[in-house]
Amino acid sequence: MAAVAAASAELLIIGWYIFRVLLQVFLECCIYWVGFAFRNPPGTQPIARSEVFRYSLQKLAHTVSRTGRQVLGERRQRAPN
């Protein structure tokens, strides 16, 4: 039973890091794709470069990071046998 709990915790941590990497990739490059849904019409400044949208994405990344640290917490030490 303890092995299953440990494996679940490891998978949760791995999944969390994968989510963070994907979020960072989204913030850095995917916003500027030509077909991205949040782009403005041609000849206008892309919404991704506007201060409000950039601030919202940065705040989202910070909130997700803080929440993840609260959920995952510190790694627990094994109880002595």
Curated annotation (Swiss-Prot):
Keywords: Developmental protein
One BP term from GO: insulin secretion
GO cellular component: cytoplasm
Keyword Cell membrane: no
Tissue specificity note: Highest in brain and ovary.
Spans through the membrane: none
InterPro entries recorded: Neuronatin
Entry keyword ATP-binding: no
Function: May participate in the maintenance of segment identity in the hindbrain and pituitary development, and maturation or maintenance of the overall structure of the nervous system.
Family from the record: Belongs to the neuronatin family.
PANTHER family from the UniProt entry: NEURONATIN
Protein name: Neuronatin
